[in-house]
Amino acid sequence: IIPGIGSTDVAKNNWAGIAIGSALAGTGLTIGENVVGMDMEAVVKEGRVTDTRDLKRRVKLYQDHQIDGYGAIVVQANVEDTRLGAQEYAVRELGVKCVELKWGQGAKNIGGEVKIKDLAKAQELSRRGYIVLPDPNSEAVITAFQRGTFRECERHSRIGMVEEEAFARRVEELRAAGAKYVFLKTGAYRPADLARSIAWSWKYGLDLITVDGAGGGTGMSPWHM
């Protein structure tokens, strides 16, 4: 399975080759975090996504080239994706069968930030539930931006933390929405945390765990862990 490739330009600009190639090979492919939230053409009503451009395109490219049902397209979600209902939308509207929960920032100690140079986009991301710094809705910030005092905001994704009750509830919600397979992606954290992820995944019937590498991975990796 190809691990999560999310909203970055590297993924977006090369998605056709990745999706079609992995589908023809019968290899699973994971759509990473923030794809819905960063899609400025996505339709979000009352805090929940009802239509998308980017996610729909990514899923369809894979599905259209699958052979005899081999492989799988997987939709990953972080905190913001979950609040937007991205996985429920993918399952119900796009026919996705596999979803992946994400703890932390995978192989990264911290991170999840993106530079936003367009004030209107920063404001929309704030409305969609992201942490945007400085606050793009502040009158003082708007004035300073228009004067050229600064030229970009930072969008931050929240670090996914979990308690057992909430984890069990989320797995059940995804099953009820129609997900056939539920995966978990976590990092190479403390042995106690790895043991917890394995124990809970077994207890609540998850189908696959991905342990993101401490010596590699994506984004700001590798880090000494």
Regions found by a protein language model. Name each.
Residues R147-M225:
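Glycine-rich phosphate/ribose-binding loops and adjacent secondary-structure elements
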Residues Y62, Y70, Y89, Y130, ...:
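Sequence-level detector for tyrosine residue identity
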Residues G32-V49, W103-G106, I131-V132, N137, ...:
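Glycine-rich, proline-tolerant flexible connector loops at the mouths of alpha/beta enzymes
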Residues N13, G85-Y89, F145, C153, ...:
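Residue-level detector of functional hotspots within protein domains
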Residues I1-L125:
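N-terminal capping/small domains of soluble enzymes
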Residues G111-I116, Q123-L133, R196-V211:
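Carboxylate/His-rich catalytic cores and anion/metal-binding grooves
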Residues R53-R58, P136-V141, V162-R169:
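Short low-complexity stretches enriched in small and charged residues
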Residues D51, K115-D118, D135-S138, E164, ...:
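Serine/threonine-rich low-complexity intrinsically disordered regions
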